[in-house]
């Protein structure tokens, strides 16, 4: 057992507060709890800014072209810096890089308040994408370091629940504070990022990857180890999964409002309807991923999402979307912990952050394709993007899921670690 795993088993009082939901034994893992709480706090801060960023930029004179460039700058920099951030984390320590990433995000959130030239918003978003690239890969790698293979499904289920809780709380808090002032939103977002930093520094007391020997081991990992059959399967899944994210970022609110007649309040409700069932289901599905072939969960519940996308494309009113989003949140929760645990099990210990970065990069590439390609289809017919998303996602699930199943059969990784 590694030093980080031993540290992860130290029980702390805060775990007792949420143990009935997530399982007391898992929350005795201090590293898992620290990472989950830190990500929840960080993404609460991120979510707070989401509903006000564009409005704030407009209030400072940003045109629609600048606002579009802001979104592109973030996505491009986040994609470009995924692998470099993982490379650094594998050599210099996941905890250290995660702390630096969170501190940088806090400083950049505060910088919004001092911008007077709208063009600088584009530069700021590029810097935010670069800073954010290191957070999730380092967090997921820390969990893999601290949790035994046979419990990683449950661990990533808990992590997913905390992650989505942050995104659920953030926009609600941000929207409420924006009625007072935009500045208060950015200031509180900084506070949440700093709280995340403190959680990581105080609760994760053992760092790996600090010795020269560890850095040499990380450097010695060949590139082919990052593109094994089970990992390629996971990368394909990430690409297909993020296609809808691109649609969501670029088109979904317009689709709901203009074609299905949804009010702004109902649009917000649809996302809440997705998040709450997902948060509840993720810890349960994580434990299931430790007891069942992960390829089975990925194939069955991945393909179960295909008809949902097709039904979205057939709808003419918005209210059914809220109901279907709730179902979708549950089905998605039954897949994601299995995928996360699979990625962790398929990666070498000295290359975990790089593998996580590549996994995120393939997902971001999928979101690029979704945002650009599906926007063109939307101009032809508003139903086409959803039909195409469903078909492409289904193909990615079949191809990626079969690769993972073949890897299990060959013994490249355990079917049930």
Q: Where is each model-derived feature located?
A:
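Structural signature of the two symmetry-related core transmembrane helices
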Residues: 96-110, 296-310
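A late C-terminal transmembrane helix in Major Facilitator Superfamily
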Residues: 352-379
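Symmetry-related core transmembrane helices of the 12-TM Major Facilitator Superfamily/SLC fold
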Residues: 185-201, 386-401
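Helix-to-loop junctions at the C-terminal end of transmembrane segments
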Residues: 82-93, 281-293, 378
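Juxtamembrane intracellular "pre-TM" segments in multi-pass secondary transporters
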Residues: 11-29, 206-234, 417
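Short amphipathic helix-loop junctions that connect adjacent transmembrane helices
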Residues: 52-64, 250-265
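Residue-level signature of mid-helix packing/kink "hotspots" within the transmembrane helices
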Residues: 75-83, 167-168, 275-279, 283, ...
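Cytoplasmic helix-loop-helix junction between adjacent transmembrane helices
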Residues: 124-163
């Amino acid at each position: 057992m590694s030093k980080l795993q031993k540290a992860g088993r130290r029980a702390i009082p805060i775990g007792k507060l949420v143990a009935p939901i997530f399982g007391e034994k898992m929350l005795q893992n201090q590293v898992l709890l620290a990472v989950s709480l830190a990500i929840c706090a960080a993404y609460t801060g991120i979510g707070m800014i989401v509903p006000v960023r564009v409005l704030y930029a407009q209030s400072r004179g940003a045109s629609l072209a600048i606002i579009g460039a802001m979104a592109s700058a973030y996505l491009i920099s986040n994609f470009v810096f995924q692998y470099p951030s993982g490379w650094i984390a594998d050599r210099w320590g996941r905890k250290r890089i995660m702390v630096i990433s969170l501190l940088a995000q806090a400083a950049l959130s505060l910088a919004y308040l001092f911008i007077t030239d709208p063009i600088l918003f584009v530069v700021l978003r590029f810097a935010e994408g670069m800073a954010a690239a290191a957070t999730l890969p380092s967090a997921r790698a820390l969990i893999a370091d601290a949790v035994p293979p046979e419990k990683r499904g449950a661990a990533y289920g808990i992590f997913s629940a905390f992650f989505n809780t942050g995104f659920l709380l953030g926009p609600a808090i941000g929207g409420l504070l924006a009625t007072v002032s935009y500045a208060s939103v950015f200031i509180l977002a900084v506070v949440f990022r700093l709280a995340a930093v403190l959680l990581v520094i105080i609760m994760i007391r053992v760092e790996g990857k600090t010795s020269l020997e560890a850095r040499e081991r990380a450097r010695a990992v060949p590139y082919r180890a990052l593109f094994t059959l089970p990992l390629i399967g996971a990368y394909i899944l990430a690409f297909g999964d993020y296609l809808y994210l691109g649609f969501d970022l670029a088109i979904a609110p317009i689709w709901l409002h203009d074609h299905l007649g949804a009010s702004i309040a109902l649009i917000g409700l649809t996302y809440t309807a997705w998040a709450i069932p997902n948060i509840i289901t993720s810890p349960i599905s994580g434990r299931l991923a430790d007891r069942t072939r992960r390829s089975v969960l990925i194939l069955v519940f991945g393909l179960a999402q295909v008809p949902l996308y097709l039904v979205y494309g057939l709808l003419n009113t918005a209210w059914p979307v809220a109901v279907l989003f709730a179902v979708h949140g549950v089905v998605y929760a039954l897949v994601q912990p299995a995928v996360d645990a699979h990625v962790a099990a398929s990666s070498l210990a000295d290359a975990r952050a790089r593998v996580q970065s590549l996994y995120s990069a393939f997902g971001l590439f999928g979101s690029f394709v979704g945002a650009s390609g599906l926007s063109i289809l939307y101009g032809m017919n508003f139903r086409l993007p959803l039909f195409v998303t469903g078909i492409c996602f289904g193909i990615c699930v079949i191809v990626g899921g079969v690769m993972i199943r073949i890897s299990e059969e060959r013994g490249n990784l355990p079917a049930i670690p």
